[in-house]
């Protein structure tokens, strides 16, 4: 009951602030009918949901099964985008592990497995569900630094994989977001955050 009150207050305040879209929060109901009812009441639609892929540490069939389940949920919600982040060997959220110099670095074979897997998932999402796969580069993951984003974008099919451009993660890596955004035209979503300046 308390979780429901927190969730309802959160989406109510979003609506009052003028927002008409939301990503799927981790406290949102897992039942699409229940979630849709709560959001429709407030005029809010789902625009995206995080998907944790494990393309270099799990069998592709297992990743695909989890991916399809999430696509079914998003399709029921009327969403058009799914945001994937490769979580194999991720140190994201490990507060005692520095993300610079201590995160996992893929070898060439793992890069091929990862990029081919993203293309495969993106094709499923687009052709079978009408949903676009966008990739979220993230601190502590195998695609964190600008050169890793560049390699991922260069080795995936733009028809099936786009970039979720995150200003905060680029800034944290020492990159200038305005310069980085000029490099990529294949963007589906943008996360705007500034980790170095007080609000």
Feature names for model-found ranges:
Residues 19, 187-188:
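Core-facing hydrophobic residues within beta-strands of well-ordered domains
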Residues 1-3, 88-96, 172-174, 197:
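Flexible glycine/acidic-rich beta-alpha junction loops that bind and position SAM and/or redox cofactors
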Residues 25-27, 51-54, 87-89, 138-140, ...:
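Active-site beta-loop-alpha junctions enriched in small/polar residues
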Residues 60-163:
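Active-site acidic/histidine proton-transfer and metal-coordination neighborhood
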Residues 2-6, 190, 194-199:
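Single conserved hydrophobic/aromatic residue that forms the stacking wall/gate
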Residues 20, 167, 195-196:
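Ser/Thr-centric signal marking residues that sit
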Residues 1-3, 7-81, 108-119, 158, ...:
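N-terminal pre-domain/capping segments
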Residues 33-40, 141-158, 173-183:
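Distinct, well-ordered alpha-helical segments
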């Amino acid at each position: 009951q308390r979780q429901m009150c927190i969730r309802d207050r959160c989406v109510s305040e979003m609506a009052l602030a003028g927002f008409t879209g939301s990503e799927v929060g981790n406290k949102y109901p897992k039942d699409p009918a229940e979630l849709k009812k709560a959001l429709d009441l407030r005029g809010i639609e789902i625009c995206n949901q995080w998907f944790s892929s494990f393309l270099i540490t799990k069998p592709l069939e297992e990743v695909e099964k989890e991916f399809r389940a999430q696509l079914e949920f998003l399709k029921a919600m009327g969403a058009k985008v799914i945001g994937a982040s490769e979580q194999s060997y991720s140190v994201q959220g490990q507060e005692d592990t520095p993300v610079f110099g201590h995160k996992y670095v893929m070898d060439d074979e793992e890069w091929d497995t990862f990029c081919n897997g993203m293309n495969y998932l993106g094709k499923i999402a687009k052709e079978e569900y009408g949903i676009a796969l966008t990739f979220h580069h993230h601190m502590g993951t195998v695609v964190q630094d600008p050169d890793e984003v560049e390699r991922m974008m260069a080795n995936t099919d733009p028809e099936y994989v786009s970039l979720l451009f995150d200003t905060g993660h680029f800034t944290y890596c020492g990159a200038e977001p305005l310069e980085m955004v000029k490099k990529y035209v294949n963007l589906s979503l943008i996360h705007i955050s500034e980790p170095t300046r007080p609000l």
